[in-house]
Amino acid sequence: MIHIIGTCHSLQVWTDAIRNGESLDARKESVEAFESYLVEVARLLKADMIAEEASGEWVAARGHGAYSVAKGVATRMGIQHLFCDPDTGQRRTIGLKVGEELRTHAMTVSKETRREWTEVHDAEVKKQFSTREAVWFERLEGCEPNNRSIIFVCGADHVNTFKAALDAKKNLASIRCRCWTKGA
């Protein structure tokens, strides 16, 4: 079964700035609390894998000393970890806009429609959810998710859509937490 935990992305990664209390993205105490929560849930569910909406590239781009909270927990617990999100090159290959290309596209649509840029950008990102979630499913599918206990950490905005996608593919899935963001 896949147990979905939604959170904010800033809690998914440790960086030197967070450890030193210099980050504007997340507080050290919040990341520590999320890390403890993952350990607790993994033990409770007897998880043998923690997968996440992230890629190694995305984690590294977060800054100096960056590493995945989920990967760290999995390593310490001696269980498998899996990055499920496509990296920049893979996103382009499957037709998704990324980085500056996405920002420019959102700016163009914003000007043409006279809508706020942030509103347009958020809508454009959400249009890509189903494609990205299909990649996550494909990567998890090879792990026989119906025959084991897998925790899947993702952004809170994906919790309902990813659960629905898993249900449609006849995968056992539950929402463990819709939005774990304590003090983020």
Role assignments for model-derived ranges:
Residues 1-184:
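Compositional signal for N-terminal targeting/processing segments
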